[in-house]
């Protein structure tokens, strides 16, 4: 029901102060009161009802009000506290609605909380004064409140007014219930007695639905942003000003939201969760079963004047060995340094304090000829079945005498193997192979994956700054089918006469833009066939917040290498 605007203060004052005018004959809401009285068996007293008819003449004399800038701000459903129009949003005392002493609690400050504004409750009365209005005789002494006008145009009017308990009008009854449990939010009051009576009470609106008008812009704004955004901003400002004590803090339902998609699009609780999952995936071979197995003999190695890396591996060193003991033992071959194996694949210059040595260590010589001299001093068996010579060197520590340790060098030629030199290498058909055994060179890796999937044209072993293997490699195929078969296999177990090792196969990653937004770098790759593309952080969370995609594991390039 729409009501006209009144300009003359005397007219408004007469509306409320004149107690001698006829009661119901000229009331603008007379028809509704009569229907309510009929439902209540004619038990209402209309002697105190305001006698203001609808004056359409005055309304017609205000054609320019809606077009003025002042009107725009005054008709905003949720005006800011800093900018209050001279006309403002019509309050209960400025409208002749046919109800004497009408006042909506919380209307003038819709974002006040229950606990932060106890003084306002004493100043603002309920819609129907229990001492002066006809409904008070029947409905008891509990003040009533009407539902607020929802900016989204929802169906809140279908719900009954939850005010029989005397609570303030909560303008966010669904977004932020202050009940301690869902059971406390059951509707009561009119709806429990008569739905028809509730509909009549709800029809007593104090103003027509107000359109969403821009306060400063030229064009219309999005209703969803206007309604929800302004609510959130004003609510936060009101709560910050009130700052209730912890003892008076209201109870809330835990973690509920009407728009769960907003939570999914927001920032994750752990901003580094993707990086952590990517690091965990690099060790996935240790906890996953192999999907296929290769067993056989590695191809023989025939070297002519090999060139070695200056770095060698020592396995089976005495547990009480020290860096000084290692340097004193091997400095006869040349100047060297010691790298102790550390956590996360790092090699610190000395063993961690309080930790026992891992049983192996790396020696880094300054010159390649020092490695040659070391190998000549080792005992080895050149007639091994796979053609791989095993070198052993005898050393001693304070508590162990003549301990034989294994020396594993690396020939630089073993780092790369090209099966077809004329074949162009396509990075999009290249896989990354992790968790490689130290005895596996590029030629052997190419032979194994070619036996399993076919189409191998190149294999390479990743090395560090000393050109020593770091336990991973790359294999390129000449067709998409072989490439996808290798990626799908994911985990392959390799069995030889010398070792058994499970390796991990993933797509080879390059620097790429996000293939969703095409505006941000895409450091995260999803290897699942449903996605199989690069993502930025925001697009990853957006895509993988969907049901059925949350189990996908991200891949990242190892920036250290």
Swiss-Prot record:
Zn(2+) 2 binds at residues 526, 531, 544, 552. The record marks 410 as: Important for the positionning of RRM1 relative to RRM2. Transmembrane segments: none annotated. CDD domains: Bbox1, RRM1_CPEB1, RRM2_CPEB1. The modification Phosphoserine is found at residue 43. InterPro entries: CEBP1_N (IPR032292), CEBP_ZZ (IPR032296), CEBP_ZZ_sf (IPR038446), CPEB (IPR034819), CPEB1_RRM1 (IPR034977), Nucleotide-bd_a/b_plait_sf (IPR012677), RBD_domain_sf (IPR035979), RRM_dom (IPR000504). The modification Phosphothreonine is found at residue 171. Residues 310-407, 429-510 form the RRM domain. Belongs to the RRM CPEB family. Sequence-specific RNA-binding protein that regulates mRNA cytoplasmic polyadenylation and translation initiation during oocyte maturation, early development and at postsynapse sites of neurons. Binds to the cytoplasmic polyadenylation element (CPE), an uridine-rich sequence element (consensus sequence 5'-UUUUUAU-3') within the 3'-UTR of mRNAs. In absence of phosphorylation and in association with TACC3 is also involved as a repressor of translation of CPE-containing mRNA; a repression that is relieved by phosphorylation or degradation. The 2 RRM domains and the C-terminal region mediate interaction with CPE-containing RNA. The interdomain linker (411-429) acts as a hinge to fix the relative orientation of the 2 RRMs. The ZZ domain (509-566) coordinates 2 Zn ions and is probably implicated in mediating interactions with other proteins in addition to increasing the affinity of the RRMs for the CPEs. A continuous hydrophobic interface is formed between the 2 RRM. This is Cytoplasmic polyadenylation element-binding protein 1. The gene is Cpeb1.
């Amino acid at each position: 029901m729409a009501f006209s605007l009144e300009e003359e203060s005397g007219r408004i004052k007469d509306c409320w102060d004149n107690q001698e005018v006829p009661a119901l004959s000229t009331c603008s809401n007379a028809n509704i009161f009569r229907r309510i009285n009929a439902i209540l068996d004619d038990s209402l007293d209309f002697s105190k009802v305001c006698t203001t008819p609808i004056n359409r003449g005055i309304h017609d004399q205000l054609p320019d009000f809606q077009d003025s800038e002042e009107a725009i701000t005054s008709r905003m459903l949720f005006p800011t506290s800093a900018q209050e129009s001279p006309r403002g949003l019509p309050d209960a005392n400025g409208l002749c609605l046919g109800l004497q002493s009408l006042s909506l609690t919380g209307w003038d400050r819709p974002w006040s909380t229950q606990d932060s504004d106890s003084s306002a409750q004493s100043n603002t009365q309920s819609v129907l004064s229990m001492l002066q209005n006809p409904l008070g005789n029947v409905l008891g002494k509990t003040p009533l409140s009407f539902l607020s006008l929802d900016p989204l145009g929802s169906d809140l009017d279908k719900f009954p007014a939850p005010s029989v308990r005397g609570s303030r009008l909560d303008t966010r009854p669904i977004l932020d219930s202050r009940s301690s449990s869902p059971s406390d939010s059951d509707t009561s009051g009119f709806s429990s007695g008569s739905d028809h009576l509730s509909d009549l009470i709800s029809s007593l609106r104090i103003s027509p639905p107000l359109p969403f008008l821009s306060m400063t812009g030229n064009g219309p704004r999005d209703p969803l942003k206007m309604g929800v955004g302004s609510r959130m901003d004003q609510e936060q400002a009101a709560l910050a000003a009130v700052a209730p004590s912890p003892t008076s803090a209201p109870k809330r339902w835990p973690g509920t939201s009407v728009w769960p998609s907003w939570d999914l699009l927001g920032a994750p609780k752990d901003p580094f969760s993707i990086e952590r999952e990517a690091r965990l995936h690099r060790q996935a071979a240790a906890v996953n079963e192999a999907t296929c197995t290769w067993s056989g003999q590695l191809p023989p190695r025939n070297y002519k004047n090999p060139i070695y890396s200056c770095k060698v591996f020592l396995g089976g060193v005495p547990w009480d060995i020290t860096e000084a003991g290692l340097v004193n033992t091997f400095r006869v071959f040349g100047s060297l340094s010691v790298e102790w194996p550390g956590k996360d694949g790092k090699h610190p210059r000395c063993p961690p304090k309080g930790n026992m040595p891992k049983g192996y260590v790396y020696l880094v010589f300054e010159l390649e000829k020092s490695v040659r001299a070391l190998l000549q001093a080792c005992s080895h068996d050149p007639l091994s079945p796979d053609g791989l010579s095993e070198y052993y060197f005898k050393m001693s520590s304070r508590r162990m005498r003549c301990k034989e340790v294994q020396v594993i060098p690396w020939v630089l030629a073993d780092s790369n193997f090209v099966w077809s030199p004329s074949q162009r290498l396509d990075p999009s058909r290249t896989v990354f192979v992790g968790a490689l055994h130290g005895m596996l060179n590029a030629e052997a890796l190419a032979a194994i994956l070619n036996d399993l999937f076919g189409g191998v044209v190149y294999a390479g072993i990743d090395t560090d700054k000393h050109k020593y293997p770091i336990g991973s490699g790359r294999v390129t195929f000449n067709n998409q089918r072989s490439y996808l078969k290798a990626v799908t296999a994911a985990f392959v177990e390799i069995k030889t006469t010398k070792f058994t090792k499970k390796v991990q196969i993933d797509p080879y990653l390059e620097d790429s833009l996000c293939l969703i937004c095409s505006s941000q770098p895409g450091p995260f790759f999803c290897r699942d066939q449903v996605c199989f593309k690069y993502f930025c952080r925001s697009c990853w969370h957006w895509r993988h917040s969907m049901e059925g995609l949350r189990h996908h594991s991200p891949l990242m390039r190892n920036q250290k290498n």
